[in-house]
Amino acid sequence: MSDSVIYKKIRETVQSNLPGSRVLLFGSRARGEEDRFSDYDLLVITPQTFTSSEKIYWSTRIDRALIDAIKIPVDLLINSEEEIRQKQELPGHIIRTAIREGIIL
């Protein structure tokens, strides 16, 4: 399966579960440093803020759907636009890294 097909499936899966969300690919695949064992590191940016338990629910649901669709594991972070604004300025925070190196899908 080509990258463009995989990216489309990721976008569609996230959008069908969390409409209005944006998806960033970051990590080794965004940097072009992946190997055959690399997962997909994804930051899902939502318009609304979710509780921790809601994030777990949505992460699990989307993760399962993506494993079924692309047969490759994903590492999924879900944060609201407000949470992104707060976290992206924190040195060493994974959100800062994801925003800096992320590719919009």
Language-model segments: which ranges?
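Short beta-strand->loop micro-motif that forms the acidic, two-metal-ion catalytic signature
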Residues: 41-45
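Catalytic core of pol beta-like nucleotidyltransferases
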Residues: 1-22, 30-36, 47-105
